[in-house]
Amino acid sequence: MGKYMRKFRGATGEELAAMEVTQVVGVRTRSRSAAAAGATTTKVQAASAASTRRRKALLPTAVVGTTRRDGGSCYLQLRSRMLFMAPPRPAPAARAPVVAEAAGSGNGAAAHAAAGLSRCSSTASSVDAAAQDRSLACRSDVAEAGSEHVPEGSASDSASGRDRERRETTPSSFLPGEVSDLESDLAGGQKRSRPLPSAATASAQQATRPKIPPAAEIEAFFAAAEEAEAKRFAAKYNFDVVRGVPLDAGRFEWTPVVSSRS
């Protein structure tokens, strides 16, 4: 930038005051100003056109034309674009056969499941019955083996008891609910048949009990301790605590004390 002073002289020779001219870098000329104004006008027109189109799009669109396809779908020709419309949903009546078919298939599956469960239950019951028969047979064999150890004097009674027990322990003679009673009876018999403690067991129990020495032994022990303590006191203080009299030889001289009452 620079400042220039220009002076002009008039025809009469008068000196006119010059005006200060300030030149700024980047000052637009007339042509540049006209071009900038034209560009601004173009931008304003484009913005107004875009806003007009936006307002038209926001307004309720009017259908210009429709084109329907075979599948039920159609295109709506709007003012600015073409809109696709999906076909309408089928009526609920068309779904009823499908639902009925699904229900029928579900019932069939439930029936198959029930049949499978019945087969499984029957198989399980047969397996349980077989296992119960085997367990009862084993119990009867054990009972027979236990009854063989009975003395000869009671052979007739044990034979009748074995026959009765064999008849009672057959699988077909009682219901499954009676098995628990039989087991409880066998357990009670085993508890009752436990042997009594022997003499060796009793002696071992006696040996483990704490021993209390007799009164005479306790008295002798304390008497010896008292005698030793009396000897130690007599040797140190020349006084016999057992008889209550002083000794002649010693470091101390004992003098009897007379009470004031006497």
Swiss-Prot record:
<dbReference type="GO" id="GO:0051726">
    <property type="term" value="P:regulation of cell cycle"/>
</dbReference>
<feature type="compositionally biased region" description="Basic and acidic residues">
    <location>
        <begin position="160"/>
        <end position="169"/>
    </location>
</feature>
<comment type="similarity">
    <text>Belongs to the CDI family. ICK/KRP subfamily.</text>
</comment>
<feature type="compositionally biased region" description="Low complexity">
    <location>
        <begin position="198"/>
        <end position="208"/>
    </location>
</feature>
<feature type="region of interest" description="Disordered">
    <location>
        <begin position="140"/>
        <end position="212"/>
    </location>
</feature>
<keyword id="KW-0649">Protein kinase inhibitor</keyword>
<dbReference type="GO" id="GO:0005634">
    <property type="term" value="C:nucleus"/>
</dbReference>
<dbReference type="Pfam" id="PF02234">
    <property type="entry name" value="CDI"/>
</dbReference>
<protein>
    <recommendedName>
        <fullName>Cyclin-dependent kinase inhibitor 1</fullName>
    </recommendedName>
</protein>
<dbReference type="InterPro" id="IPR003175">
    <property type="entry name" value="CDI_dom"/>
</dbReference>
<dbReference type="InterPro" id="IPR044898">
    <property type="entry name" value="CDI_dom_sf"/>
</dbReference>
<dbReference type="InterPro" id="IPR044275">
    <property type="entry name" value="KRP"/>
</dbReference>
<dbReference type="GO" id="GO:0004861">
    <property type="term" value="F:cyclin-dependent protein serine/threonine kinase inhibitor activity"/>
</dbReference>
